[in-house]
Every structure is written in structure tokens, then in C-alpha cells.
Design a protein with these regions (language model features):
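A short, N-terminal "cap"/entry segment at the start of jelly-roll beta-barrel domains
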Residues: 1-25, 60
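Conserved short histidine dyad/triad with adjacent acidic residue
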Residues: 27-44
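Glycine- and acidic-residue-biased ligand/ion/polar-headgroup-sensing regions
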Residues: 46-57, 62
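A cytosolic small-molecule/anion-sensing beta-strand core signal
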Residues: 53-54, 69-70, 88
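Short acidic-glycine-tyrosine-enriched beta hairpin
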Residues: 63-78
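Ligand-binding loop in jelly-roll beta-barrel domains
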Residues: 78-93
Length: 93
């Protein structure tokens, strides 16, 4: 079944948007942020890749800030705390 990932994420003024697309062989987590919204510090139990579809975010990991814009991606190791701050309206996977 064909699905368009960007159509799955609807930005909300009241909170960040989280959409999980999964089947037995993979999981994609879509995140939508309005400017100023935050994905609080957390860890992941498996390696992950963060991809910025549109917008710009500040990604913090190991005390280092990384500004990521549309098209950028970042490899996140397992069990390392990280967080995301939306600098503008943004969509990530």
C-alpha cells in the first residue's frame, strides 16, 4: 500500500505530533513540530537515523548542538540521551 510520509504528519499548535508507521520488519516514527516545540531528552534502545524532511531543528546529543536543515540526517547511537528543538516548523523521521 502506497503512503506519503509527509501527509501522515499534521503540525499542531498545542503539541508536537508523533506518528508511528510500523510492520513486523520496520518502524518509522514521524515527528512534526511547530517553531519552538521540543522533543524532550530521551534515549532509544536501538540505533536510529534522524532525517529532516523540512524545516530546521537544533539536535542536542552528548552536550553538543547540531543545527540540522531539510535533507540532513544524523545517526543516533543506542542508549545515548538526545533532544530536539524546532527552530522553525519542521517534520522529521
Amino acid at each position: 500500500m502506497k503512503r506519503i510520509l509527509k501527509d501522515e504528519i499534521v503540525l499542531s499548535e498545542s503539541s508536537k505530533t508523533v506518528k508511528i508507521l510500523a510492520n513486523p520488519s520496520f518502524k518509522v516514527i514521524g515527528l512534526g513540530f511547530k517553531k519552538g516545540q521540543v522533543l524532550e531528552k530521551h534515549t532509544t534502545s536501538t540505533k536510529a537515523i534522524l532525517i529532516v524532511q523540512f524545516g530546521e531543528v537544533e539536535f542536542l546529543m552528548d552536550g553538543v548542538k547540531h543545527n540540522l536543515q531539510a535533507g540532513a540526517f544524523f545517526e543516533i547511537p543506542e542508549n545515548v540521551e538526545h533532544e530536539v528543538h524546532a527552530l522553525v516548523d519542521s517534520c522529521l523521521y
